[in-house]
Amino acid sequence: MAKKGMINRELKREKTVAKYAAKRAELKATIANVNASDEERFEAMLKLQALPRNASPVRLRNRCGLTGRPHGYFRKFGLSRNKLRDTVMQGDVPGVVKASW
């Protein structure tokens, strides 16, 4: 299981990303707007750089909902491969069966 601090850090990042999402989108649109003046675009670029580092969605990491494990994550289920296997074998995930061919 991942450390509680790592899980909490990731949750804090998610909140920060959500908080600044609209402002980031607005600044990025201004930067990409070719009709805006160079001064406006440069000013928007500086404001974007001044935002918190954790406000960028790139810094988010998918983690298992049960253990917090960062690797082997299945987006469809929100679980790591280990816990997904356990829950499927117990029959907790409907419609998923072991492969046999």
From Swiss-Prot:
GO BP field: translation
GO cellular component, one term: cytoplasm
Pfam families per UniProt: Ribosomal_S14
Coiled-coil segments: none
GO molecular function: rRNA binding; structural constituent of ribosome
Top-level taxon in the UniProt lineage: Bacteria
Keywords on record: Ribonucleoprotein, Ribosomal protein, RNA-binding, rRNA-binding
InterPro entries documented for this protein: Ribosomal_uS14, Ribosomal_uS14_bac/plastid, Ribosomal_uS14_CS
Recorded family membership: Belongs to the universal ribosomal protein uS14 family.
Subunit comment: Part of the 30S ribosomal subunit. Contacts proteins S3 and S10.
Task performed by this protein: Binds 16S rRNA, required for the assembly of 30S particles and may also be responsible for determining the conformation of the 16S rRNA at the A site.
Protein name: Small ribosomal subunit protein uS14
Gene from which the chain derives: rpsN
